[in-house]
Amino acid sequence: MKLIIYVKEGESIDRVLKKWKQKFDKARIIRKLRERQQYIKPSERKRKILTKAKYREFLISKNS
């Protein structure tokens, strides 16, 4: 994946690094790479999403 950052003439290195970091975080490159390291079956992925949702509902009902 490529991150293209346009640098204006006379712009400081710190400013350019800040732009790069923000763009990197928005692109979620690290998360995508970690997900692609191993194959997860669609059924397992759905099960994981459902368990997270149930846990969130449990926390909400517990606090109410």
From Swiss-Prot:
InterPro entries for this protein: Ribosomal_bS21 (IPR001911), Ribosomal_bS21_sf (IPR038380)
Any one Gene Ontology molecular-function term assigned to this protein's record: structural constituent of ribosome
Record has Ribonucleoprotein as a keyword: yes
Gene assigned in the entry: rpsU
Pfam hit, one: Ribosomal_S21
GO cellular component, one term: ribonucleoprotein complex
Domain of life: Bacteria
Any Gene Ontology biological process: translation
Species of provenance: Karelsulcia muelleri (strain GWSS)
Record-given protein name: Small ribosomal subunit protein bS21
Family of the protein in this entry: Belongs to the bacterial ribosomal protein bS21 family.
Keywords: Ribonucleoprotein, Ribosomal protein
Ribosomal protein is among the record's keywords: yes
Transmembrane segments: none
